[in-house]
UniProtKB/Swiss-Prot annotation:
The lineage of its organism: Bacteria, Pseudomonadati, Thermodesulfobacteriota, Desulfobacteria, Desulfobacterales. The keyword Transcription applies. Keywords: DNA-directed RNA polymerase, Nucleotidyltransferase, Transcription, Transferase. This is DNA-directed RNA polymerase subunit omega. It comes from Desulfatibacillum aliphaticivorans. InterPro entries: DNA-dir_RNA_pol_omega, Pol_omega/Rpo6/RPB6, RPB6/omega-like_sf. Belongs to the RNA polymerase subunit omega family. Its EC number is 2.7.7.6. It is an enzyme of class 2 (transferase). GO terms for cellular component: DNA-directed RNA polymerase complex. Transmembrane segments: none annotated.
Amino acid sequence: MARITIEDCLKRVPNRFLLVHMAAKRVRQMREGSEYLVSSPKNEDIVVALREIAADKVYVSDNMPDEL
């Protein structure tokens, strides 16, 4: 995948505040040991999280506890 942009992510998550919340939560999950959902070698966790969101691999669940 080429360079990831916020616009790519906003196509999947139209609310930019929700996008930031999702990316932060996903980074936290990865740092706690969760596996990456997309292949993205040599990238920082935030870039991987945004790639996952743009690829529609991450979604919001109503049952998800809010830890932010």
